């Protein structure tokens, strides 16, 4: 789940009004808990007791996996089914009306998407002050993190991933939705290494013949027409970004980069990039179809699906548009299980028929999800019928046994798979023992688990962990895309690059808001994001005195993980949070009505834009700002999932079914490995806790010291081969460079 701190997309069209959260809202419901296991608890609020973990609705919160300025992402487990989910928790009280509007639009768009390579939204829970989005958990992390750790992909592996990306993006375009922030940080991997596109915070609906004018996205992935300030139809900017992504997958670096925004802009507008010697002719050919300066001559995704390179190894299985299957809401086995949980057939039918994003629909959908360990749908002991799905051979989506497409996908999966690290997983009990939902009491209970990070403390994001959700931007108004939580936290790394790191190593792109545009050289922007027709249509060139955004290193610029020119930014208006007025001068009288209460909302008041300086001068000055305060402290139970009590019966490490991501193996007893790990981490000056018998949660640096803060976990796992154990390292927060340095140091000390 990307979720990144980013500028919220502007309202490109009049249709950008408040979305409808609809049936997902349940603020009028009060405490509800699993009567079998947890006693009475509030279904739609967070609560905690001395011996239990906090809960939200039917979900037990396990740990924080991402943080943004006004949002958090929690890894949680659905009590009734045992499935893991990611819950995005957004503090609505911190958001201005424009930000709320964009948040509701994102939710509305996610409700309409049902593709195996797009993160699925299961449930929406809304209270007066908080919005909870229950989404699919992509446990294997970001494609970005893989590229940082392993470098470029082989073309066969990149092809398997890229087919899924193209299928998902084409599906969005078929539904008249443009993503506008496609990049490696927003591509997640599930337990089977299938792509999951996340972070629709900048997405918008488009109409043929109607132009969009909002400049948003990460500069290295942004199309040239965006740098020129031209209006665009929509899909063509995603197609350019797909070309950059393909180049990145195959080469491990970016086709367009620069020491500052001015240099990057010039390179993008030239459209010239280096072709690595190892890139095949067919791959080079398809790249040239994506990276075309003239958007009118850029290829379409329908043409790409017929390209030779994308279908190599898939003879007879040409990539075709995804056909969304008819929803199977009549699975009697799942319905019977839900009846055993305490739901009535009537409410099940109503929720599924009306497609309400409430607890009933979420339970039904989660019962049909695969378990990561078993790979089968449904709960253990239940022969749940599979939901009908289209064949992978035609749609190039998630892997399915038996097809040649799956052969390539399995090969890719073996390379990229990262297992989740929780040893406390226990699937749902057989049908007769399924926990029952408890009755709902009235009353709207507010959050008690923990406060959302404040504006100052929220400048850094902590957390994607596996959800490779990218970190929050350290500066400007990420409230404008509140539904973004960052993983992991990034601070600019002042340390030198380790010698064992490749010079072209990937660096993360932050997310920012371009808050103002020049009034004299750029079309005036109304607070609703519409352009004033009295202006011109181009962004002026960058100021010659552009601020340097990152120090160069080698032939290509080498930026820290939080590098600014790789940040997503957006040319919308930003409300002055202190004055409570829009940047255009329109007074905001309060947040918009919740879309769960009103399906139509009046447009935000408009006003005259105030005069500003050059766009790129303003942007670069903001992008060069750095947060000097210490990031929000990671301490206590928030350090890891590990404040969970040990399972007293657990005497062996977790069995790692897919061991391809394990780099260190040993035949030592697991207890001896843990002892060696404790010594090695102590020698590396890490502060460690042991939340589970075979898991260490470690912190290094930070607290005002010279070294950046790094938060990671080390787990000893049992491999399928008898008598062989593996050591898994997982970065939770901090820069990739610092993490890799620590892993190398600890691994050398282990002498495995």
From Swiss-Prot:
Residues 1-36, 385-615 are annotated as: Disordered. The modification Phosphothreonine is found at residue 214. PROSITE patterns: KA1 (PS50032), PROTEIN_KINASE_ATP (PS00107), PROTEIN_KINASE_DOM (PS50011), PROTEIN_KINASE_ST (PS00108), UBA (PS50030). Its EC number is 2.7.11.1. It catalyses: L-seryl-[protein] + ATP = O-phospho-L-seryl-[protein] + ADP + H(+); L-threonyl-[protein] + ATP = O-phospho-L-threonyl-[protein] + ADP + H(+). It is an enzyme of class 2 (transferase). Residues 324-368 form the UBA domain. Ubiquitinated with 'Lys-29'- and 'Lys-33'-linked polyubiquitins which appear to impede LKB1-mediated phosphorylation. Deubiquitinated by USP9X. The modification Phosphoserine is found at residues 423, 543. The active site is at residue 181. GO terms for cellular component: centrosome; ciliary basal body; cytoplasm; cytosol; dendrite; gamma-tubulin complex; microtubule cytoskeleton; microtubule organizing center. Interacts with MAPT/TAU. Interacts with gamma-tubulin. Interacts with ODF2. Interacts with USP9X. Interacts with YWHAQ. Interacts with NLRP3; promoting NLRP3 recruitment to microtubule organizing center (MTOC). Serine/threonine-protein kinase. Phosphorylates the microtubule-associated protein MAPT/TAU. Also phosphorylates the microtubule-associated proteins MAP2 and MAP4. Involved in regulation of the microtubule network, causing reorganization of microtubules into bundles. Required for the initiation of axoneme extension during cilium assembly. Regulates the centrosomal location of ODF2 and phosphorylates ODF2 in vitro. Plays a role in cell cycle progression, specifically in the G1/S checkpoint. Reduces neuronal cell survival. This is MAP/microtubule affinity-regulating kinase 4. It comes from Mus musculus (Mouse).
């Amino acid at each position: 789940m990307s979720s990144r701190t980013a500028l919220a997309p502007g309202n490109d069209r009049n249709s950008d009004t408040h979305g409808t959260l609809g049936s997902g809202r349940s603020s009028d419901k009060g405490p509800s808990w699993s009567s079998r296991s947890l006693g009475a608890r509030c279904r739609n609020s967070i609560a905690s007791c001395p011996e239990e973990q906090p809960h939200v609705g039917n979900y037990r919160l396990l740990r924080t996996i991402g943080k943004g300025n006004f949002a958090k992402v929690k890894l949680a487990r659905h009590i009734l089914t045992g499935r893991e989910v990611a819950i995005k928790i957004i503090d609505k009280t911190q958001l201005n009306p424009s930000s709320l509007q964009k948040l509701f639009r994102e939710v509305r768009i996610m409700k309409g998407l049902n593709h195996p390579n797009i993160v699925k939204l299961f449930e929406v829970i809304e209270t007066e002050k908080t919005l909870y989005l229950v989404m699919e958990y992509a446990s294997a992390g970001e494609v970005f993190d893989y590229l940082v750790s392993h470098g470029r992909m082989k073309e066969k592996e990149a092809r398997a991933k890229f087919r899924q990306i193209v299928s998902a993006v084409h599906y969005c375009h078929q539904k008249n939705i443009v993503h506008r922030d496609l990049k490696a940080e927003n591509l997640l991997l599930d337990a089977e290494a299938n792509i999951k596109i996340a972070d629709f915070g900048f997405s918008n609906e488009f109409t043929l013949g109607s132009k969009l004018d909002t400049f948003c996205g990460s500069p290295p992935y942004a199309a040239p027409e965006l740098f020129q300030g031209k209006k665009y139809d929509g899909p063509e900017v995603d197609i350019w970004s797909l070309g950059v992504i393909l180049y990145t997958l195959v080469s491990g670096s970016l086709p367009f980069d620069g020491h500052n925004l001015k240099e990057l802009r010039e390179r993008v507008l030239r459209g010239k990039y280096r072709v690595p010697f190892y890139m095949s002719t067919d791959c080079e050919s398809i790249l040239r179809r994506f990276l075309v300066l003239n958007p009118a001559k850029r290829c379409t995704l329908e043409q790409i699906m017929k390209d030779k390179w994308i279908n190599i190894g898939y003879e007879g299985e040409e990539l075709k548009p995804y056909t969304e299957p008819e929803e199977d809401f009549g699975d009697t086995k799942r319905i019977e299980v839900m009846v055993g949980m305490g739901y009535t057939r009537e409410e099940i039918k109503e929720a599924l028929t009306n497609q309400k994003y409430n607890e009933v629909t979420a339970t039904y959908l989660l019962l049909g999800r695969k378990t990561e360990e078993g790979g089968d749908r449904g709960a253990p002991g239940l022969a749940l019928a599979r939901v009908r799905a289209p064949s992978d051979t035609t749609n190039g989506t998630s892997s399915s046994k038996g097809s040649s497409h799956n052969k390539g996908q399995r090969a890719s999966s073996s390379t990229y798979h990262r297992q989740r690290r929780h040893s406390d997983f226990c699937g749902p009990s057989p049908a007769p023992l399924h926990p029952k939902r408890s009755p709902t009491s009235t009353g709207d209970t507010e959050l008690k688990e923990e406060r959302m990070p404040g504006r100052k403390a929220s400048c850094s994001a902590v957390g994607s962990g596996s959800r490779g959700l990218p970190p929050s931007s350290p500066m400007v108004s990420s409230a404008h895309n509140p539904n973004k939580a960052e993983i992991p936290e990034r601070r600019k790394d002042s340390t030198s690059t380790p010698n064992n790191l490749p010079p072209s190593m990937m660096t993360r792109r932050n997310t920012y808001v371009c808050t103002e545009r020049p009034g004299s050289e750029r079309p005036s922007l109304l607070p609703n994001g519409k352009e004033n027709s009295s202006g011109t249509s181009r962004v002026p060139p960058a100021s010659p005195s552009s601020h340097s955004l990152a120090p160069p290193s080698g032939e290509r610029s080498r930026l820290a993980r939080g590098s600014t020119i790789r940040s997503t930014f957006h040319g919308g208006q930003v409300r002055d949070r202190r004055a409570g007025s829009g940047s255009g001068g329109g007074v905001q009288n309060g947040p918009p009505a919740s879309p769960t209460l009103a399906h139509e909302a009046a447009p935000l008041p408009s006003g005259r834009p105030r005069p500003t300086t050059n766009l790129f001068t303003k942007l670069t000055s903001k992008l060069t700002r750095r947060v000097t305060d210490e990031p929000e402290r990671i301490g206590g139970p928030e350090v890891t999932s590990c404040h969970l009590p040990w399972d007293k019966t657990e005497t062996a490490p977790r069995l790692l079914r897919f061991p391809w991501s394990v780099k260190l193996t040993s035949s030592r007893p697991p207890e001896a490995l843990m002892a060696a790990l404790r010594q090695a981490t102590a020698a590396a000056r890490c502060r460690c806790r042991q939340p589970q018998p075979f898991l260490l949660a470690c912190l290094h640096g930070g607290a005002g010291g010279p070294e950046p803060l790094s938060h990671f976990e080390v787990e000893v796992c049992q491999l399928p081969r008898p008598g062989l154990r593996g050591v898994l390292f997982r970065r939770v927060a901090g820069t990739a460079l610092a993490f890799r340095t620590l892993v190398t140091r600890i691994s050398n000390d282990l002498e495995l």
